[in-house]
Curated annotation (Swiss-Prot):
It comes from Rattus norvegicus (Rat). This is Sushi repeat-containing protein SRPX2. It is found in: Secreted; Cytoplasm; Cell surface; Synapse. Disulfide bonds join C72-C106, C92-C118, C123-C164, C150-C177, C265-C307, C293-C320. Contains chondroitin sulfate chains. Residues 70-120, 121-179, 263-322 form the Sushi domain.
Amino acid sequence: MKTGSLTQRGALLLLLLLAPAVTPTWYAGSGYSPDESYNEVYAEEVPDTRALDYRVPRWCYTLNIQDGEATCYSPRGGNYHSSLGTRCELSCDRGFRLIGRKSVQCLPSRRWSGTAYCRQMRCHTLPFITSGTYTCTNGMLLDSRCDYSCSSGYHLEGDRSRICMEDGRWSGGEPVCVDIDPPKIRCPHSREKIAEPEKLTARVYWDPPLVKDSADGTITRVTLRGPEPGSHFPEGEHVIRYTAYDRAYNRASCKFIVKVQVRRCPILKPPQHGYLTCSSAGDNYGAICEYHCDGGYERQGTPSRVCQSSRQWSGSPPVCTPMKINVNVNSAAGLLDQFYEKQRLLIVSAPDPSNRYYKMQISMLQQSTCGLDLRHVTIIELVGQPPQEVGRIREQQLSAGIIEELRQFQRLTRSYFNMVLIDKQGIDRERYMEPVTPEEIFTFIDDYLLSNQELARRAEQRDVCE
């Protein structure tokens, strides 16, 4: 027994001597080596119950949560934050989210029962919107506000601002930029044009309108309402309207006025015993009016007048005077020249004044003087046998020489009744061997001998002789 007691005492003494030589591998109250700087959970160890001491103030290392805080409750009271058995509730500052354990406890192993850290909260990056952009106050972080704006020409529809919320989502919805602005269009200036001479219209040109889209610059269509540039415009005011459409079907219109002015002269009055024929409208710049006289009358003065740009007529008006026939000429040609382009001639030839056909014909013609005058017909009578032969135009007597030449020129015999109708150009147009009614003569003249001007005049005077 004595030997055994000595052996136990020696072993205890050896343990006491060796204990100071062991280097500790932890700091008091931390449970971590000097290089450790974050929370980490280790498997719980079963410590030597003789080593546990709840009185040690720093059994575990002091918790320090960056961007957060630890609220600890110790069995020894509120002033102890890392003693054995202390329980700490972990939380993060606003804008940060706790990753890890919400609650940890200081274990007998001198370690905390878990780890946690605070991660800054972020929302996903917002996509850019078509034809627009956004700016944010603090990037994609919590409470950052992103304000949307659209490119020129577009309007924002939807939420103008979105805020990054605590759940990591953005408030509101994604807006869109809509093109609701119409294009910009500018028409050419209104213009006034003078009608061309002898015309009631004017050709007007202009440049196309200036068109620009306020959004993406794309103009899909430009329509014109009215005549094209270079068209002939009649007298008056004409509205020309253009309409432009952009890609979003917005439209804008503009208009301008084309005014065509016709310079006009005072309306001419027809001469007494005559009439006028005018070109164009009869009173516009460049119009030509010709004076004509009724049958049995001839024009004295200028044959025509022109409407000038000064709005005045050229020359002075002529007059229609009774036609004066000079029978004291040297030849039948000289006599006929007086009727050239003025009068038609109806030459009546008979063997003697008592001829039945002659008397019948002259009687009918004397009753139709108005119709003959309207058709510009002068009657020449050649009656009898030499030396008592008589030739006359109205009341004027023809010489024997003129009578003979007329018979030869027109091949008129003295042997029987015969009659010839001569037009204004001196051409033999119809012969009659027996009396005819004035209506037959008038029908032939109206159908074959009247000019267009005379036809128009006849239409105006259709009922004059009734």
